[in-house]
Structures are given as structure tokens and as C-alpha cells.
């Protein structure tokens, strides 16, 4: 922990209620401090830290009464110590400082303990107690309900990752706990599944059971469909099975995946799984987005390892964080296990680019986008088994905005032959190409009318390309 002494404008200092352990500031104490300041008494500098959300602001760790007193006497600049906490919890640091002159009240201690645990469930009762001046037993009582809720939530997250056969070591790393802790939680899994299966056996529907137990619906489907073959699973989900190479659906099945830019239909993923994988195969999803692939793998009894640059450990623990750096492209997992099927559904160049992270590949130039894909295909090839198949989903990109069809050029466009060329250059050979058109609903009547008058051709083509290693 570092400390830097300096003087800063008082307007740059904020009292952040999120890390202030007291219920209120004492006007009497502020007035006393202000009087001492006027009389020339030396006052200890206020302790602050750089505000996590505003680079030009500081928030108070210790000295809220002194700060108010400085404001009362009209000070414009005040002496401070800027503290670098190096991972220490700011609320607990502030609480430990606050109990120096006066112990926290019972209400303040309880509130601070609960807020600290909600912010960081890895904190022990001993650590919290040391900061707020209370015994471990007292803290246990303060946070008992929060701890129980956290344990239930952790059980469900572990069950979710375990259902997709993510190794315990990676689960432990995901949640910041010991692998032994994961093993202990896994012992509860049969009982959790039994409760859900009991309700299913009583005739409750999958949505009803999911809502009752707080499970994601795809996880309930994984139990409801246990022991069934893929065709039976299609029937249970009320999905027809297409036996031709045109895969078009009017809408995504909202039971699978989150509301996400560029969301793909779960029905499409189910068809890919049916034709190009078997139950218990390992599916690798390098750009998971809203989690459609993982959810569909639950319903079709496939193992699934998913990765994405958007890290959502609370809502999507099974999607592990991964940023594909074009300057240093690395496979996100180590070990001998290699996937049976890779489903690669990246952003379709500039489509939806306004809804994606600007640091992602949709923010790249055409040349860099294709360069990234070629590097990824080569990396996937070197991390695949001889029998591994890859599915590449993408769409034509044409710069057709305000451009009549006969005036279009290939300068900015990316078409299927561009993708096929770099796939072949990277050691992959296509075996099937499915048409999976994008919805044309985004072309509203007035837009269509304008396009017709200007002789503009829009893009709805999307391809599902199935590949094997050469």
C-alpha cells in the first residue's frame, strides 16, 4: 500500500456513500473541527483514493468530518494523502479508520459487514470483523442469509459449468476458490438434480420448474431430455428437422441464448449438432456472445467450452473470458483435450458493429479482419484433432448503402469466396455449404421502396460452412 502527500482542490474530493461506514456525519464534530482549524491547530491530512470511475476525482477513505470542516471555513485546497490500496477493500479500510476515534454503532457495523460481503463474497468473517471491530461470530450472524444465498448461487454456477464438462481446475479459477471447494460443491449436485427431476416427474413443465428452482431453462431441458436420442430431443423442443441445405427460420427460439447483437437461432445450432456431432462430443465456441451454443449443447447432451471477450461471471459463468489479440493470437486452453467440433460464429465484419465492442474484430479494417480470420483458422487447425470438424458461420458483406447495384465494386466487399480461399490456405476443406439467410425484417417498407427506386440490392445471405482438416 502506497501513500502520496499533496494538496488538491476541495472540489475534486467526493464523499462516496458506497464506502462510507457511518450512517451520517456529526454536525457537532464538524463544527468543533472547523473551530480548531480557524484557531490554527494542525489537522491530519484527509486520506483519499483516486475515484475508480473519474480520473480527476478522489473519494474519501478517512476524514469525512475534516472535509466538511474545510468546506465550512471556505478552504479551496486541502492537504491529502492519496492511498493506493493494492487490492484492499476500500469499505473495510474506511471502516477500520473510522473506528479509531469512535466505534461503529451496531447498525453501522451490520450494514458495513453486509455491504463488504456483497461486494466481495471471498472475504472471511475474521477479515470483516477486524475492520469493523466485531468478533467473527458477530459477523457470521450479520451475513448468515447473504452467505446462504451466495452458496446456493455458487452451487448453481458450478452445476452449470459441470453440466458442460468444464474441468474443475478452470471452475476454481473462474470463481477464485480452491479446487477442493469445487469438489465439495459437486457432491451436492445429485441432490439438486433430484429436486428438479421430482418436479418434472409430477408433470410440471420445463418453464415452471426453471422458474421455481431459479435454473436457466436449458439446464432443466438437459434433465428433462436425459436418455433421449437427438430426434426425440428435436420433437420435445417442437423443432422440425431440415434434411436439405436451406436453413431458414423466422425467429430465434428465446429459450436459448441471451438477447445479444447478431444472435443466431438455436435451431441452427441444433441442426449442426445433429448432423456433425454425436452426444458427449466436445464442442468449442470461441466467440460465444449470448451463449446460444452452450445452451443448445445442454439440450442435446454435448460438452461445450465457450469463450468471449465480454466477461459475465454472474450470469454466464460457463462463458470464460478470452480476448483474441491479433498481434499475439493464443489458444485459450492448455492440455491434451481437443474439440470434436468447433463452431465459429464471429461478427460479420461491419454488421452490428455499432453494438459490439470497438476493440473487437468488427472494428477492424477489411484487411485486418481477413488477416485475423486467416490467423484464427490456422490456430484452430493446429489445436484440432485429425477428425475435428469446424463450422464457420458468416455472411456476405457488400457496401451497398446508397449505391445502385450496377455501380458496386469489390473494393470494400467480402464474399463467400474470400472466406473459402483463406480457409483453404489455412488447411481446411469445405464439405458442405448451407444457406441460412438473415432476416429481411430490418428492411422496412419505406426502406425497401427507396432501395427499389435507387436499384439497390441489400444483403440477407448467410452461410454455414462445414469444414474438415485437409
What is the role of each PLM region?
Residues 5, 62, 119-121, 163, ...:
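Helix-turn-helix/winged-helix DNA-binding modules
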Residues 62-65, 108, 264:
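A generic structural signal for residues located within well-ordered alpha-helices
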Residues 17-34, 68-164, 189:
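Amphipathic, charge-rich alpha-helical segments that serve as recognition/docking helices
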Residues 54-56, 152, 461:
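Exposed loop/turn and edge beta-strand positions of beta-sandwich/beta-sheet ligand-binding modules
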Residues 21, 65-66, 101, 302, ...:
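Short, cationic motifs built from Arg/Lys/His that form the positively charged side of catalytic pockets
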Residues 7-18, 91-94, 246-252, 351-358:
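Short, basic/glycine-rich phosphate-binding loops at helix/coil junctions
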Residues 158-176, 181-470:
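Class I S-adenosyl-L-methionine-dependent methyltransferase catalytic core
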Residues 1-83, 252:
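Short, charged/polar connector segments at secondary-structure boundaries
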Amino acid at each position: 500500500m502506497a501513500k502520496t502527500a499533496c494538496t488538491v482542490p476541495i472540489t475534486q474530493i467526493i464523499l462516496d456513500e458506497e464506502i462510507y461506514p457511518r450512517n451520517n456525519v456529526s454536525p457537532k464534530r464538524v463544527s468543533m473541527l472547523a473551530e480548531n482549524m480557524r484557531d490554527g491547530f494542525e489537522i491530519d491530512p484527509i486520506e483519499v483514493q483516486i475515484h475508480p470511475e473519474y480520473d480527476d476525482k478522489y473519494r474519501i477513505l478517512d476524514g469525512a468530518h475534516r472535509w466538511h470542516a474545510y468546506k465550512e471555513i471556505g478552504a479551496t485546497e486541502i492537504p491529502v494523502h492519496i492511498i493506493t490500496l493494492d487490492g484492499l477493500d476500500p469499505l473495510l479500510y474506511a471502516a477500520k479508520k473510522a473506528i479509531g476515534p469512535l466505534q461503529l454503532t451496531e447498525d453501522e457495523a451490520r450494514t458495513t459487514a453486509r455491504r463488504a460481503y456483497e461486494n466481495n463474497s471471498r472475504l472471511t468473517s475474521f477479515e470483516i470483523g477486524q475492520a469493523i471491530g466485531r468478533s467473527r461470530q458477530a459477523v457470521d450472524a450479520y451475513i448468515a442469509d447473504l452467505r446462504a444465498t451466495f452458496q446456493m448461487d455458487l452451487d448453481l454456477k458450478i452445476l452449470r459449468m459441470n453440466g458442460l464438462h468444464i474441468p474443475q481446475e478452470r471452475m476454481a479459477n473462474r470463481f477464485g476458490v480452491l479446487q477442493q471447494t469445487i469438489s465439495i460443491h459437486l457432491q451436492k449436485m445429485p441432490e439438486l438434480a433430484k429436486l428438479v427431476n421430482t418436479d418434472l416427474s409430477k408433470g410440471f413443465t420445463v418453464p415452471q420448474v426453471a422458474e421455481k428452482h431459479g435454473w436457466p431453462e436449458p439446464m432443466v431441458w438437459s434433465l428433462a431430455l436425459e436418455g433421449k436420442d437427438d430426434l426425440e430431443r428435436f420433437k420435445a423442443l417442437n423443432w422440425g428437422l431440415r434434411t436439405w441445405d436451406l436453413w431458414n427460420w423466422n425467429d430465434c427460439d428465446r429459450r436459448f441464448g441471451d438477447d445479444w447483437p447478431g444472435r443466431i437461432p438455436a435451431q441452427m445450432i441444433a441442426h449442426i449438432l445433429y448432423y456433425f456431432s454425436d452426444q458427449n462430443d466436445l464442442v468449442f465456441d470461441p466467440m460465444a456472445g449470448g451463449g446460444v451454443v452452450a445452451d443448445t449443447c445442454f439440450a442435446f447432451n454435448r460438452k461445450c467450452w465457450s469463450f468471449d471477450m465480454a466477461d459475465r461471471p454472474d450470469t454466464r459463468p460457463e462463458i470464460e473470458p478470452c480476448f483474441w489479440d491479433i498481434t499475439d493470437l493464443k489458444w485459450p486452453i492448455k492440455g491434451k483435450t481437443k474439440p470434436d467440433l468447433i463452431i465459429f460464429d464471429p461478427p460479420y465484419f461491419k454488421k452490428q458493429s455499432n453494438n459490439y465492442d470497438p476493440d473487437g474484430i468488427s472494428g477492424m479494417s477489411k484487411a485486418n479482419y481477413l488477416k485475423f480470420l486467416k490467423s484464427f483458422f490456422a490456430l484452430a487447425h493446429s489445436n484440432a484433432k485429425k477428425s475435428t470438424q469446424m463450422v464457420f458461420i458468416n455472411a456476405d458483406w457488400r457496401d451497398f448503402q446508397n449505391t445502385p447495384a450496377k455501380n458496386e465494386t469489390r473494393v470494400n466487399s467480402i464474399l463467400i469466396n474470400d472466406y473459402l480461399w483463406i480457409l483453404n490456405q489455412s488447411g481446411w476443406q469445405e464439405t458442405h455449404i448451407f444457406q441460412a439467410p438473415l432476416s429481411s425484417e430490418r428492411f422496412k417498407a419505406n426502406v425497401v421502396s427507396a432501395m427499389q427506386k435507387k436499384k439497390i440490392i441489400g444483403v440477407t445471405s448467410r452461410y454455414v460452412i462445414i469444414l474438415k482438416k485437409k
